[in-house]
């Protein structure tokens, strides 16, 4: 009697670097591979081939990408490279000539085909019986997911090379976005994080064309998209919002509890001179007035932003202007980066004085200390208040979660002590009272 052995599934290792947009690209590739019967493994040693999704936004990200590619080659030998750094394939091949394939961002089919070339899918695989969840493969915890609504960007910020890597704005059909959101919610997702290169430009490229979802007309526009997402009964958080005038239309939705009162707006600087050099909107006085107006309409509004210090041409006067602006703006969550030249960025050609590295570091230190004091004071005002917390982790010390003013990975946490025998699990939403705070985090007790 002969024994029939079933061939094992081909195995793929995957490393995803960079921003949430790249993470969504990775999820899409992995979903396709899983549908074709590939098994995703967690170690280089177990993989038949390794895919590295790179980041190429700044030099440190490129260095990390090259390092990870080298590590994958050393540990496995068969490496496929994709992502933003892939647009400059020669740089990758000069350092790592043995890579099997190099593709740029959003080239999903080429990546899958490259995997096929190295390790073909099983011929006997039946995709109709494969256990790929309806929402696809996700690299985030089950209770939150990134929802990418567009690709590319129409802006020409002088420090950025995103348009050259990801192209001009291409908005996803509104029906497709809402169908994906509905599948995610049905699968148990409690928080949708809306992302793109420029979320508030959604629909500009198609002139806000009217689409259809659930038999109803819906404009391909951020306001209408948020209205529809807000009807799904989950947290909806907006990231990468460019401060267009129509952002004002979102504040009533936040005040009414339809979407989270949270805006992630990368202002980048406040000095009119530096903003002009960056090719960013230079209406910092109007921005302060808008922030004041937003908070009058929605007192719970949380504003997150990112800034760059040490940009070419930045003087001490410009930097002090930025600190004074921060004092006026009273932003809740802030990140700061020291300017780093990016190959191919227009800023490299500016006729402006280069800021020395030691001055950049000094300004970064002062910026962070200044904003920490603002953040600490604003969080102190939360003590004694009742908040809803979405639980991310539970261990023997208690639970770690986030309330509406905390995005995962980039903002603070809420630490909660739990009684013995507690049934609280990741993904639960619980009501808590804030008992303490520091510069970034809150401590709370369960109600």
From Swiss-Prot:
It comes from Pseudomonas savastanoi pv. phaseolicola (strain 1448A / Race 6) (Pseudomonas syringae pv. phaseolicola (strain 1448A / Race 6)). It is found in: Cytoplasm. CDD domains: Radical_SAM. Residues 139-377 form the Radical SAM core domain. Signal peptide: none annotated. Its EC number is 2.8.4.4. InterPro entries: Elp3/MiaA/NifB-like_rSAM, Methylthiotransferase, Methylthiotransferase_CS, Methylthiotransferase_N, Methylthiotransferase_N_sf, NA-bd_OB-fold, Ribosomal_uS12_MeSTrfase_RimO, rSAM. GO terms for cellular component: cytosol. This is Ribosomal protein uS12 methylthiotransferase RimO. The gene is rimO. [4Fe-4S] cluster 1 binds at residues 19, 55, 84. Binds 2 [4Fe-4S] clusters. One cluster is coordinated with 3 cysteines and an exchangeable S-adenosyl-L-methionine. GO terms for molecular function: 4 iron, 4 sulfur cluster binding; aspartic acid methylthiotransferase activity; metal ion binding; protein methylthiotransferase activity. Its cofactor is [4Fe-4S] cluster. Gene3D superfamilies: Methylthiotransferase, N-terminal domain (3.40.50.12160), Nucleic acid-binding proteins (2.40.50.140), tm_1862 like domain (3.80.30.20). One of its GO terms (biological process) is tRNA modification. The keyword S-adenosyl-L-methionine applies. Residues 380-447 form the TRAM domain. NCBIfam families: 30S ribosomal protein S12 methylthiotransferase RimO, MiaB/RimO family radical SAM methylthiotransferase. It catalyses: L-aspartate(89)-[ribosomal protein uS12]-hydrogen + (sulfur carrier)-SH + AH2 + 2 S-adenosyl-L-methionine = 3-methylsulfanyl-L-aspartate(89)-[ribosomal protein uS12]-hydrogen + (sulfur carrier)-H + 5'-deoxyadenosine + L-methionine + A + S-adenosyl-L-homocysteine + 2 H(+). Its main location: cytoplasm. Catalyzes the methylthiolation of an aspartic acid residue of ribosomal protein uS12. Keywords: 4Fe-4S, Cytoplasm, Iron, Iron-sulfur, Metal-binding, S-adenosyl-L-methionine, Transferase.
């Amino acid at each position: 009697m002969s024994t029939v052995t079933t061939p094992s599934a081909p195995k793929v290792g995957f490393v995803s670097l960079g921003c949430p947009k790249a993470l969504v690209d990775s999820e899409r590739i992995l979903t396709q591979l899983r549908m074709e019967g590939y098994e995703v493994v967690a170690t280089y040693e177990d993989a038949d081939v390794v895919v590295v999704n790179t980041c190429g936004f700044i030099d440190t990200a490129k260095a990390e990408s090259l390092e990870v590619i080298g590590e994958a080659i050393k540990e496995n030998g068969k490496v496929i490279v994709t992502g933003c750094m892939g647009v400059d394939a020669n740089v990758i091949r000069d350092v790592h000539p043995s890579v099997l394939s190099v593709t740029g961002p959003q080239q999903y089919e080429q990546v899958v085909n490259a995997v096929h070339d190295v390790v073909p899918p099983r011929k006997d695989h039946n995709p109709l019986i494969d256990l790929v969840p309806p929402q696809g493969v996700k690299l985030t915890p089950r209770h939150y997911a990134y929802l990418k609504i567009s690709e590319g960007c129409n802006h020409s910020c002088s420090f950025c090379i995103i348009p050259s890597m990801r192209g001009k704005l291409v908005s996803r059909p509104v029906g497709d976005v809402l169908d994906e959101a509905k599948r995610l919610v049905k699968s148990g997702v409690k928080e949708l994080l809306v992302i793109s290169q420029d979320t508030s430009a959604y629909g500009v490229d198609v002139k806000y064309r009217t689409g259809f979802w659930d038999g109803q007309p819906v404009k391909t526009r951020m306001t209408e998209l948020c209205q529809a997402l807000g009807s799904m009964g989950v947290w909806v958080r907006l990231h990468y919002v460019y401060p267009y005038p129509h952002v004002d239309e979102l504040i009533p939705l936040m005040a009414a509890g339809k979407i989270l009162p949270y805006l992630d707006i990368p202002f980048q600087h406040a000095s009119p001179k530096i903003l002009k050099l960056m090719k960013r909107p230079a209406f910092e006085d109007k921005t302060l007035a808008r922030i004041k107006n937003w908070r009058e309409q929605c007192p719970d509004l949380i504003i997150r932003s990112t800034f760059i210090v040490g940009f070419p041409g930045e003087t001490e006067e410009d930097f002090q202007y930025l600190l004074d602006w921060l004092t006026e703006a009273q932003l809740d969550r802030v990140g700061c980066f020291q300017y780093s030249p990016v190959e191919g960025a227009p800023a490299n050609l500016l006729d402006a004085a280069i800021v020395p590295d030691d001055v950049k570091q000094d300004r970064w230190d002062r910026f962070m200390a200044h904003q920490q004091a603002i953040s600490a004071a604003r969080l102190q005002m939360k003590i004694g208040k009742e908040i809803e917390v979405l639980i991310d982790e539970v261990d023997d010390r208690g639970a770690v979660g986030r309330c509406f003013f905390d995005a995962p990975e980039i903002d603070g946490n809420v630490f909660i002590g739990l009684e013995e025998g507690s049934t609280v699990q990741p993904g639960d939403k619980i009501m808590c009272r804030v008992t303490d705070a520091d510069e970034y985090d809150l401590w709370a007790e369960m109600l």
